[in-house]
């Protein structure tokens, strides 16, 4: 009977949430459950491509596609709304478009930028966070070149860019920048030698997930393209002039008219308001990706702190993990609907590739180090596969990297 259908509610159409939906809609009939997907935008965007749109090497439109283009409307009700409250005990979710009841809840609300309380960071630095921030940043970079070219009183700081963070996002953004800068210089008649790109990293090593050989390749490649690295140099503040850094216990002002923060992400702030034991927007889940005390609430993606059995630290927040969690959660939701026990999540690490612009990269694929053009090719394969897994061959052909 239709009135006996369980209500399955999925919050967020990022990698984890949309993967849950696209897999679940293939596994159940419309009579088995009333499935609702809530997302604040009517589009999904490829978050792992944000560094490209932020640098301007691709358009922001290349990042996104309509959620409804991959949703089976006969089985899934899509609602464009912003979630404002999760009441786990009353089994209700409040949004700006009304209140939704649930029997099974999947929380996959995605990430936000984490500034670690650094003074002025939110006010003065660009973030690599979503489609809107990407549009603003790429436009700002070009505006500064245009301003420099048209001004009688040249301000060299218009051609200075400082990036905070030499982790994955920071390095990939730097790679795209080194592709974009020659285009901008050519367009606006600017001498490329006048452009100054600086990367500041507090940790003693950049890209800590990779071997020294791969890190050295990335550093050499980017330095040859004009990037200056300041490693082991914490940023203590951001202001209207740029970043304030600490060097040998002394503060120094680094000046630029474009400063970018790419050194941290956290789960949605709604997590702290809705659940206990949340740190930086992430909650520790059980092995089946539900949370303690609530066998009908799954938390996946950037809001999930999943610690594999026998280990001490949670897995990092990556699209690969989020996608696998989404696939697994779809199966577990199906199990619950059929009165079957849930299964434990087992992550399969297929590797990681960090792009250095369109033609180079470093990475580890199935335990083997790769670099150069081979890594760049693998990155395109990974990006295209991610689109294929959500939208099939048609979407992969339209939005993929080949």
UniProtKB/Swiss-Prot annotation:
Pfam families per record: Pyr_redox_2
Cofactor(s) needed by this chain: FAD
Q: What is its main location?
A: membrane
Q: What does the entry list under GO cellular component?
A: plasma membrane
Keywords per UniProt:
Cell membrane, FAD, Flavoprotein, Membrane, NAD, Oxidoreductase
Residues annotated as binding FAD: 12-16, 39-40, 83, 302, 319-320, 379
Please state which protein family the record places this protein in.
Answer: Belongs to the NADH dehydrogenase family.
Q: What is this protein called?
A: Type II NADH:quinone oxidoreductase
Protein source organism: Staphylococcus saprophyticus subsp. saprophyticus (strain ATCC 15305 / DSM 20229 / NCIMB 8711 / NCTC 7292 / S-41)
